[in-house]
């Protein structure tokens, strides 16, 4: 094998490894955002929020854009603002309580350019509330990632609503109040 071939293969491998790392970090974010939180041993939202923040760069941006999400989510710049965003979502729960939501990602596109990357997904998410009300939400994600000290992190989460549709009340008859899937 020539040095040129080895260099080309190395470059291709680096892109593939970067895509895999980005895919894992985006999936971990969605996993941590599920309710109930499936991460074993995470019993409170403050701990969950810190695990989510570990996925972000210090200067990251989290924003909801478009006519539906502008007013609902707005823009949070930096980890402290992102922490406040998640505290408003999980820490200030109102009645009815959110009992179940699960994030499903599809239509993935990841574009790596050295130590930066962008990824786009479509996301579907069923919600079930304690009063029986249920909905299905879909949004598009256009996220940015940056390699920091050899580790890929999220530098921007940008989400735009595709639709919100009601589901039949109590659409899920059986669901866990907590997750034990990852219990050792």
Residue ranges and their predicted role:
Residues 33, 56-57, 64, 123-125, ...:
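Short beta-strand segments enriched in hydrophobic/aromatic residues
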Residues 3-10, 95-184:
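A beta-strand edge to alpha-helix "cap/lid" segment located at domain peripheries
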Residues 39-41, 70-72, 128-132:
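A generic structural signal for short coil/turn motifs at secondary-structure boundaries
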Residues 1-54:
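Short, low-complexity N-terminal intrinsically disordered segments enriched in polar/charged residues
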Residues 19, 42, 76-79, 135:
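Generic detection of long, well-ordered alpha-helical segments
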Residues 46-121:
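A solvent-exposed, acidic/Ser-Thr-rich amphipathic alpha-helical stretch
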Residues 33, 37, 90-94, 127:
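Structural motif corresponding to the C-terminal cap of alpha-helices
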């Amino acid at each position: 094998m020539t040095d040129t071939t080895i260099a080309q293969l190395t470059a291709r491998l680096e892109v593939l490894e970067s895509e895999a790392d980005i895919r894992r970090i985006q999936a971990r974010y969605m996993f941590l955002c599920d309710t109930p939180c499936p991460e074993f041993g995470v019993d409170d939202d403050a701990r969950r929020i810190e695990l989510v923040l570990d996925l972000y760069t210090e200067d990251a941006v989290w924003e909801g854009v478009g006519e539906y999400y502008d007013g609902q989510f707005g823009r949070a710049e930096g980890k402290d603002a992102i922490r406040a965003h998640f505290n408003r979502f999980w820490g200030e729960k109102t009645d009815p309580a959110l009992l179940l939501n699960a994030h499903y990602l599809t239509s993935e596109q990841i574009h790596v350019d050295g130590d930066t990357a962008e990824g786009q997904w479509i996301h579907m998410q069923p919600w079930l509330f304690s009063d029986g009300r249920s909905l299905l939400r879909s949004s598009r994600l256009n996220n940015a990632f940056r390699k920091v000290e050899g580790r890929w992190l999220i530098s921007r989460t940008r989400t735009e609503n595709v639709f919100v549709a009601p589901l039949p009340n109590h659409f899920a008859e059986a669901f866990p109040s907590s997750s034990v899937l990852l219990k050792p």
